[in-house]
Regions:
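Lipid interaction determinants
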Residues: 2-11, 16-19, 33-186
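Bacterial N-terminal signal peptides
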Residues: 19-31
Length: 186
């Protein structure tokens, strides 16, 4: 009968002894992917439009919190509970690098959308965004969808507030400011 070598007999215990440290290192690496928060919550907020801040946008998820038009008026957003199929009608935006490509996805008030995004020289920009084709012409979310997707296509300035509550600011070509609140789940 063939008897396993000493190295073969010790390999499983060696592998088992590495399992816990490897798991701890993996968890630490995942935690490092989160947007850093400012260590001093009493410090004045930093400039969210600092070009370095937007570089931290990858692998985050956001929900539209407010929309201020260029003239200072607020665009009305749908209530949280008015979406189709129990889905909130308030638009969302998720920015992911899970497959090695910067991908944007979200909910635009009526339909889901997806496409690519880029971060260059402190500017966040979106490639063509494709969406599903549900019809929601009379819903609050449906009325917001076309302007929302148009705003994403015309971002001229982006800012990221890292101090709680974390917020993403997108300023459009026509001067509107969309403010997003951080979502814990994508």
């Amino acid at each position: 009968m063939h008897k396993p070598s000493a190295a073969a007999r010790t390999r499983p215990s060696f592998v088992r002894s590495l399992s816990a440290p490897l798991a701890a290192i993996s968890l630490a690496a995942l935690a490092a992917c989160a947007i850093p928060t400012h260590p001093d919550s009493s410090a004045p907020p930093s400039d969210p439009f600092n070009p370095a801040a937007i570089q931290l946008i990858d692998d985050t998820s956001w929900q539209l919190a407010s929309w201020r038009n260029a003239d200072g008026t607020q665009r009305e957003l749908p209530p949280q509970d008015q979406g189709a199929n129990g889905q909130p009608a308030v638009p969302t935006l998720t920015l992911s690098t899970a497959d090695g490509v910067r991908r944007a996805a979200g909910f635009s008030g009526c339909n889901r959308f997806g496409g690519t995004y880029a971060v260059k020289n402190g500017l966040l920009s979106f490639g063509p965004l494709a969406g599903t084709r549900m019809a929601c012409p009379n819903s609050a979310g449906g009325k917001l969808e076309a302007p929302y997707l148009d705003a994403l296509a015309h971002v001229t300035k982006a800012g990221l507030q890292m101090q709680a509550p974390q917020q993403l600011y997108l300023v459009t070509q026509d001067g509107a400011t969309l403010t997003f609140s951080r979502r814990d789940t994508p």
